[in-house]
Amino acid sequence: MMHAVTRKDSIQKLTVLNTKSETPFIPYQGKIIRRITTNELGFSKTLQDTSSRIRYVGTRIVNVLHRNTRGWVIKNHLFFRENTVLNAYILADNERYLRSLDFIRDARIVVRRVGNTDSVDVEVVTKDLFTITGALKVKGVKGIGARGAEANFLGMGQRIQITTLLDRNRQPAFGYEFLYSKSSLGKSLATITVGYTVVNSGISTGMEEEKALYFRIFRPLVSPYSRLAGGLEISFNSSQNYFRKPEPDFYRYAYDLVDVWAGYNLGVTKLLQKGAIRDRSFLALRLLHNDFTHLPEQVAGNFDPVYNSKKAVLAEFTLFRQDFYKSNYIYGFGTTEDIPSGYNLAITTGWFKQLQLQRPYAGFNANHFVTSKRGELAQYFVRAGGFWNNGKMQDASLLVGGNMFSKLYLLNTLKLRANVRFSYTRTFNRITSEPLRINNPFGLRSFRADSAQGIQRISMYTESFVLTTYRVLGFQLAPFGFTDFSLLSPNQEKIYKQNLYSGFGGGVRTRNENLIFGTLELRFIYFPKTPETFRAFKIAFKSNLRFRYNSRYVKAPDIIQLNSDETLQY
């Protein structure tokens, strides 16, 4: 367990420490909340010391351009109310939830006593991200694309995004996208999104340019004391031959998607009366209908993991206990990060249809999150699943692995940390599922060739990074070095006899924590062994990387994914 802290009030100087999230609120457990106020900081103040001011030209400019989140918008994202009993765990969960919002950089909830009464006042202090973003992409002399977005338009928790494209090789030459999103619509804590695109920025199931009209709504389980979670996605998609590929090479297809799920936190009313108990159970049901109304001729009626119609009814029972610690300098550059500690076990069963093949499915996903007194962090996981057909298992899989961080080392003004990730994957009797590949989070970073495929995979990634105090225009620099290894077996032979794929190199990451777009990364890589068409040396630049420790309690029921993973950063 990480060390806790003792305070006279719920916070003194808003300092981020390695402490349990609920610790500042425990002294006020059971008090009556008299009043709730909000305090939206500008870019000239910090959460660590609200009395000091940051004064430079950039701060003045963004303060002029930016509209702070309105107080009523912040209150729409709260799940505690005035004239109710204070629950320390709910306040801690709410503070963490506020930090997860796209337009909030950091948040603190401050509790203050009201004289000698049994009442308290609660102040919600937030610091926004600068949410106006833009991007420009030049494609030689014949093409140019631009994207502009405001993720907190008018300070009302709504996102407006417009993308345009002009390319002489494209017919028509002009393309566009429009997206609108609203957070916690009607105090529901649900986010709605609607969009239309002709520039391949939708779901894009296939490999061609796609046109799409889509609608999404998502409500997370914001706290172990919350009752409901769920989501809905409806989209209409079709491939478009904008760049006039020859017909034999172009995959012409169209598909409609309806994906809905909902879940209920079992026994939450009883557990609310016993606030310290954090063990929970959650039951969810998902209905999936992905219908290809037009199939590409290249696939016809053959099994294909991408271009087949799919229907599924999946139920998932989740047992979990996740407490959180407030820490920093893990994935971020100093802003508060919420680190889970505990377990999460999800058991999934249901029915799945692909083309005319109908099969029952069963699987499980077990995760253990560990923190130590020294500040070390780890996530260990075991995932397995498969289909039953004709008296035997089909498309069965096993995936085990871990993701570990060392404690934070201080060397003068430098902060150093190491990260190790490893995984082992095995598939059995593959019929319709994708083969294992290494161009994903369970393989080699920036290795884009998809010709390396197999049924068994072992991977390990190690990285050491240094966080400096040096800034350029508000962007903090973090150099890193890494090694990457993968063994991939295409058959039943022993995996240690297979060819070793590896990558070595280093680079630098940078981020301005006041801006909404994510981390920028420049990576230099050497691959000793590559396919013939793949260069051994590579320079990779990525923008808008979202490095954040996974902290979701539950998700939509799903089959085990072997070539992608939202809980591992990539």
What name fits each language-model region?
Residues 1-391, 404-570:
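Immediate N-terminus of the mature polypeptide
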